[in-house]
Regions:
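Hydrophobic/small residue at the entry helix of a nucleotide-binding pocket
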Residues: 2
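Residues at the starts of beta-strands that form the adenosine-phosphate
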Residues: 7, 15-16
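Short, structured coil segments at secondary-structure junctions
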Residues: 13, 32, 121-122
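Conserved SAM-binding motif I beta-strand of class I
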Residues: 19
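Rossmann-like dinucleotide-binding domain for NAD(H)/NADP(H)
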Residues: 74-184
Length: 184
């Protein structure tokens, strides 16, 4: 959802769009003019790389030394997703070399501490923000409605596809705690 929204905005600036997502719907990507590529092609070809992935066992540390070194001189890495997706030490090292630029608002430890080494980097090459990009009136309204809809669906016995771990129903605690709501 976030990636598609970003792609639509980038298209307005006539950007050439490529993406790496092993689970992407090719037809949707084609309809938006997005070329799907492998991760190394994305890293080596892009002027801007925006990370919008979820943290899963497959994505933790997906951007490391090899991927960062593949980036073009002065390309910009943008991370508004989660810090765990990028190897922090590798990112710090390449930023100290001055090869790439970066903008990010996610940290291994939030809020950022005053002695964080990223604070010593050249502010013309690195934009550091607190984790707040998702805070907008529209986002808050969307999440509030989605939460209410999910609760109503749950109480009506409807699985609307938003249950991340379907095995939760097999956990004994669900019978004792979840069942209280379910049987109400």
């Amino acid at each position: 959802r976030n990636g598609l929204a970003l792609a639509q905005r980038a298209k307005a600036f006539d950007m050439n769009l490529i993406a790496y997502d092993p689970y992407a719907d090719k037809a949707k990507a084609d309809a938006l003019g997005i070329q799907l590529v492998d991760l190394m092609t994305l890293m080596s070809s892009s002027d801007y790389v925006s990370i919008l992935a979820r943290v899963t066992p497959e994505t933790v540390g997906m951007i490391g030394t090899k991927e960062l070194n593949a980036m073009k001189q002065d390309a910009c890495l943008i991370n508004t997703a989660r810090a765990a997706l990028v190897d922090t030490n590798a990112l710090l090292a390449i930023l100290k070399q001055g090869k790439i630029r970066a903008a990010f608002e996610v940290w291994d430890q939030e809020p950022i501490s005053g002695d964080n080494p990223f604070l010593d980097l050249d502010p013309l090459r690195v934009l550091l923000l607190p984790h707040f990009a998702g805070c907008s009136v529209e986002r808050i309204t969307f999440h509030s409605k989605a939460a209410a809809d999910n609760i109503i669906n749950f109480l009506n016995g409807i699985d609307n596809g938003h249950i991340f771990d379907k095995n939760v129903f097999d956990v004994p605690a669900f019978e004792t705690h979840g069942g209280i709501l379910w049987n109400s």
